[in-house]
Regions:
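Non-transmembrane catalytic domains and loops of membrane-associated enzymes and transporters
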Residues: 1-147, 161, 165-176, 187-189
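Core segments of transmembrane alpha-helices
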Residues: 70-71, 195-200
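Transmembrane helix-loop junctions at the membrane interface of multipass transporters and ion channels
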Residues: 79-85, 200-211
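Catalytic cores of secreted or luminal carbohydrate-active enzymes
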Residues: 152
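Membrane-helix boundary/juxtamembrane motif in polytopic membrane proteins
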Residues: 179-195
Length: 211
Protein backbone atom coordinates (compact mmCIF):
# COMPACT_ATOMS: atom_id res chain seq x y z
CA UNK A 1 0.00 0.00 0.00
CA UNK A 2 1.17 3.52 -0.74
CA UNK A 3 0.39 4.51 2.85
CA UNK A 4 3.12 2.13 3.99
CA UNK A 5 5.83 3.93 1.98
CA UNK A 6 8.18 6.17 3.97
CA UNK A 7 9.81 9.11 2.18
CA UNK A 8 12.77 10.90 3.72
CA UNK A 9 13.96 14.35 2.69
CA UNK A 10 16.90 16.17 4.21
CA UNK A 11 16.16 19.58 5.70
CA UNK A 12 17.29 22.45 3.41
CA UNK A 13 20.60 24.04 4.36
CA UNK A 14 19.80 27.53 3.02
CA UNK A 15 16.85 29.76 2.19
CA UNK A 16 16.90 29.17 -1.58
CA UNK A 17 16.85 25.40 -1.09
CA UNK A 18 13.88 25.82 1.23
CA UNK A 19 12.14 27.95 -1.39
CA UNK A 20 12.74 25.26 -4.02
CA UNK A 21 11.25 22.66 -1.69
CA UNK A 22 8.18 24.75 -0.93
CA UNK A 23 7.72 25.42 -4.64
CA UNK A 24 7.64 21.66 -5.21
CA UNK A 25 5.06 21.32 -2.46
CA UNK A 26 2.88 24.07 -3.95
CA UNK A 27 3.02 22.49 -7.39
CA UNK A 28 2.09 19.14 -5.88
CA UNK A 29 -0.86 20.67 -4.02
CA UNK A 30 -2.25 22.40 -7.13
CA UNK A 31 -1.80 19.30 -9.28
CA UNK A 32 -4.47 17.71 -7.08
CA UNK A 33 -6.96 20.37 -8.14
CA UNK A 34 -9.03 17.90 -10.18
CA UNK A 35 -9.68 15.93 -6.99
CA UNK A 36 -11.97 18.72 -5.83
CA UNK A 37 -14.44 17.78 -8.58
CA UNK A 38 -17.46 15.59 -7.73
CA UNK A 39 -16.39 13.05 -10.38
CA UNK A 40 -12.78 12.05 -11.08
CA UNK A 41 -11.05 10.12 -13.84
CA UNK A 42 -9.99 6.56 -13.07
CA UNK A 43 -6.99 4.67 -14.43
CA UNK A 44 -9.02 3.20 -17.31
CA UNK A 45 -10.13 6.66 -18.45
CA UNK A 46 -13.70 6.47 -17.17
CA UNK A 47 -15.13 8.82 -14.57
CA UNK A 48 -16.58 7.83 -11.25
CA UNK A 49 -17.79 9.48 -8.07
CA UNK A 50 -15.05 11.14 -6.05
CA UNK A 51 -14.25 8.84 -3.10
CA UNK A 52 -12.67 11.56 -0.94
CA UNK A 53 -14.22 12.37 2.41
CA UNK A 54 -15.16 15.85 3.62
CA UNK A 55 -11.99 15.90 5.72
CA UNK A 56 -9.85 15.14 2.66
CA UNK A 57 -11.59 17.95 0.77
CA UNK A 58 -10.80 20.28 3.65
CA UNK A 59 -7.13 19.28 3.64
CA UNK A 60 -6.83 19.91 -0.10
CA UNK A 61 -8.49 23.32 0.21
CA UNK A 62 -6.33 24.25 3.19
CA UNK A 63 -3.16 23.44 1.24
CA UNK A 64 -4.34 25.67 -1.60
CA UNK A 65 -5.19 28.42 0.89
CA UNK A 66 -1.73 28.22 2.43
CA UNK A 67 -0.04 28.82 -0.93
CA UNK A 68 -2.11 32.01 -1.40
CA UNK A 69 -1.30 33.59 1.97
CA UNK A 70 1.82 35.49 0.86
CA UNK A 71 0.27 36.89 -2.37
CA UNK A 72 -2.86 37.93 -0.46
CA UNK A 73 -0.86 39.71 2.24
CA UNK A 74 1.20 41.55 -0.37
CA UNK A 75 -1.94 42.73 -2.20
CA UNK A 76 -3.49 43.83 1.10
CA UNK A 77 -0.32 45.75 1.99
CA UNK A 78 -0.32 47.64 -1.32
CA UNK A 79 -4.03 48.47 -1.08
CA UNK A 80 -3.63 49.52 2.55
CA UNK A 81 -0.95 52.06 1.67
CA UNK A 82 -2.36 53.21 -1.67
CA UNK A 83 -6.03 52.45 -2.17
CA UNK A 84 -7.93 53.16 1.05
CA UNK A 85 -8.57 56.26 3.19
CA UNK A 86 -6.86 56.50 6.57
CA UNK A 87 -4.02 54.09 5.65
CA UNK A 88 -2.44 54.28 9.11
CA UNK A 89 -5.53 52.71 10.68
CA UNK A 90 -5.69 49.90 8.14
CA UNK A 91 -1.96 49.33 8.39
CA UNK A 92 -2.48 48.82 12.12
CA UNK A 93 -5.26 46.31 11.41
CA UNK A 94 -3.03 44.45 8.96
CA UNK A 95 -0.19 44.44 11.49
CA UNK A 96 -2.53 43.03 14.13
CA UNK A 97 -3.59 40.25 11.76
CA UNK A 98 0.07 39.49 11.09
CA UNK A 99 1.11 39.56 14.75
CA UNK A 100 -1.96 37.92 16.30
CA UNK A 101 -0.71 34.29 16.13
CA UNK A 102 2.58 35.26 17.79
CA UNK A 103 0.79 37.36 20.43
CA UNK A 104 -1.48 34.45 21.33
CA UNK A 105 1.46 32.04 21.56
CA UNK A 106 3.43 34.46 23.75
CA UNK A 107 0.42 35.00 26.03
CA UNK A 108 -0.06 31.23 26.30
CA UNK A 109 3.60 30.71 27.23
CA UNK A 110 3.47 33.55 29.75
CA UNK A 111 0.36 32.31 31.54
CA UNK A 112 1.29 28.61 31.64
CA UNK A 113 4.23 28.72 34.02
CA UNK A 114 5.31 25.33 35.38
CA UNK A 115 4.91 25.12 39.15
CA UNK A 116 8.57 24.24 39.77
CA UNK A 117 9.98 27.03 37.62
CA UNK A 118 10.84 30.35 39.25
CA UNK A 119 9.32 33.52 37.87
CA UNK A 120 12.53 35.12 36.59
CA UNK A 121 13.73 32.09 34.53
CA UNK A 122 10.19 31.71 33.21
CA UNK A 123 10.10 35.33 32.05
CA UNK A 124 13.52 34.94 30.44
CA UNK A 125 12.39 31.84 28.54
CA UNK A 126 9.17 33.52 27.43
CA UNK A 127 11.14 36.58 26.33
CA UNK A 128 13.57 34.46 24.32
CA UNK A 129 10.69 32.63 22.66
CA UNK A 130 8.92 35.91 21.92
CA UNK A 131 12.08 37.36 20.37
CA UNK A 132 12.45 34.29 18.17
CA UNK A 133 8.82 34.48 17.01
CA UNK A 134 8.97 38.22 16.31
CA UNK A 135 12.27 37.80 14.45
CA UNK A 136 10.64 35.16 12.28
CA UNK A 137 7.75 37.50 11.53
CA UNK A 138 10.21 40.24 10.60
CA UNK A 139 12.08 37.94 8.22
CA UNK A 140 8.81 36.79 6.66
CA UNK A 141 7.81 40.41 6.11
CA UNK A 142 11.18 41.25 4.57
CA UNK A 143 10.93 38.44 2.02
CA UNK A 144 7.18 38.81 1.41
CA UNK A 145 7.48 39.91 -2.27
CA UNK A 146 9.73 36.94 -3.01
CA UNK A 147 7.41 34.55 -1.17
CA UNK A 148 4.45 35.86 -3.17
CA UNK A 149 6.41 35.68 -6.42
CA UNK A 150 7.54 32.08 -6.20
CA UNK A 151 4.11 30.98 -4.92
CA UNK A 152 2.32 32.57 -7.87
CA UNK A 153 4.91 31.20 -10.29
CA UNK A 154 4.47 27.65 -8.98
CA UNK A 155 0.68 27.99 -9.18
CA UNK A 156 0.77 29.43 -12.71
CA UNK A 157 3.14 26.74 -13.99
CA UNK A 158 0.96 24.01 -12.53
CA UNK A 159 -2.29 25.42 -13.92
CA UNK A 160 -0.71 25.81 -17.38
CA UNK A 161 0.60 22.26 -17.44
CA UNK A 162 -2.53 20.81 -15.86
CA UNK A 163 -5.12 22.58 -17.99
CA UNK A 164 -3.43 23.56 -21.26
CA UNK A 165 -0.12 21.92 -22.17
CA UNK A 166 -0.69 18.70 -20.17
CA UNK A 167 3.06 18.11 -20.30
CA UNK A 168 5.92 17.99 -17.78
CA UNK A 169 3.58 17.46 -14.82
CA UNK A 170 6.19 15.15 -13.29
CA UNK A 171 9.14 17.44 -14.03
CA UNK A 172 10.86 18.14 -10.71
CA UNK A 173 14.21 19.24 -9.40
CA UNK A 174 14.67 16.94 -6.43
CA UNK A 175 16.22 18.06 -3.16
CA UNK A 176 19.31 15.92 -3.79
CA UNK A 177 19.88 17.61 -7.15
CA UNK A 178 19.30 21.04 -5.66
CA UNK A 179 21.60 20.45 -2.68
CA UNK A 180 24.41 19.24 -4.95
CA UNK A 181 24.65 22.67 -6.54
CA UNK A 182 27.26 25.16 -5.40
CA UNK A 183 26.60 27.09 -2.21
CA UNK A 184 24.62 30.24 -3.12
CA UNK A 185 26.44 33.55 -3.02
CA UNK A 186 25.09 37.01 -2.25
CA UNK A 187 24.73 37.58 -6.00
CA UNK A 188 22.62 34.43 -6.27
CA UNK A 189 20.30 35.69 -3.56
CA UNK A 190 19.88 39.06 -5.29
CA UNK A 191 19.24 37.31 -8.61
CA UNK A 192 16.63 35.00 -7.10
CA UNK A 193 14.99 37.63 -4.88
CA UNK A 194 14.80 40.60 -7.26
CA UNK A 195 11.07 40.81 -6.47
CA UNK A 196 11.95 42.21 -3.03
CA UNK A 197 13.91 45.11 -4.51
CA UNK A 198 11.35 45.74 -7.26
CA UNK A 199 8.46 45.57 -4.81
CA UNK A 200 10.11 47.98 -2.38
CA UNK A 201 11.00 50.52 -5.07
CA UNK A 202 7.52 50.31 -6.61
CA UNK A 203 5.85 50.80 -3.24
CA UNK A 204 8.04 53.84 -2.48
CA UNK A 205 7.26 55.43 -5.86
CA UNK A 206 3.52 54.81 -5.63
CA UNK A 207 3.39 55.97 -2.02
CA UNK A 208 5.14 59.21 -2.99
CA UNK A 209 2.69 59.83 -5.84
CA UNK A 210 -0.51 59.07 -3.94
CA UNK A 211 0.48 60.39 -0.50
Amino acid sequence: LLSEVLLYEQYPNNYLSDVARRSRWIRGDWQLLNWLKPRVRKADGTRDRNPLTALSYWKLLDNLRRSLVAPSLLVLLFFTLLGVPNPVYWLGVLSLIWLLPAILCIAHDLLHKPLRRRLKPHLLLVGAGALKRLSGIGINFAVLPHEAGYSLKAIAVTLWRLGISRRHLSQWVSHSQDSNQARPTVACFYQAMWQNVAGGVTLMILTGQFA
